Amino acid sequence: VYLTLHTLSLPLDRLEPFLDARLLPPERELLLDLYTRRCQDRLPAAYLTNEAWLGEHRFYVDDRVIVPRSFIAELLDEQLAPWIDDPWAIESALDLCTGSGCLAILTALAFPNAELAAVDLSDDALSVAARNVADYHLTDRVELIQSDAFTKLVGRKFDLIISNPPYVNAESVAALPPEYLHEPELALGSGEDGLDFTRII
């Protein structure tokens, strides 16, 4: 239903008024192609719509980044309470493995005084992040950096560091559903036990 409503530019929260509507031939062809790509090719819905949601926040995504699905977003909704006593005291923050930039953006929204460094190894991912940062009008507060973890951050310190790094072990990567095979493996797998990048942090 979501794919249909999104593709036809219909409101996602009001299905009933359109239940008796008839599709035009071009609309039927468009939807048939969409359903084929989703059901036969097993493309993630987020790649078909070029959008993913974390709570009420929409982000652009494509196959250059993994589909955002981090529980950290829920923690940021609460400004990381109880671990952060004074959100206004956070003046600098780092998002390692930023991907689409969604967590960096949510961090900037949660901590209004913070300047963000958003780091990723992938230039492709950073291109997607740049689009999202611009969409949220945060280019003056979120700096995008191509770096392998802390390599290009020597000497820099941060009040807060967040990260949703690759953490899937090799056995689990091999057993993932077909949808995950369309996502960048660099952002999912992290060695035999899934902890290669975590050890770096």
Where are these regions (language model features)?
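N-terminal accessory segments
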Residues: 1-46
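Active-site catalytic microenvironments for nucleophilic, acid-base chemistry
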Residues: 6, 110, 135
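Active-site/binding-pocket entry motifs
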Residues: 9, 65-66, 167
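A secondary-structure boundary/capping signal
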Residues: 19, 62-63, 164
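Short, solvent-exposed loop/helix junctions and linker helices
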Residues: 24-28, 66-69, 191-195
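SAM-dependent Rossmann-like transferase core, predominantly class I methyltransferases
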Residues: 29-112, 116, 121-128
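S-adenosylmethionine
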Residues: 113-115, 119-201
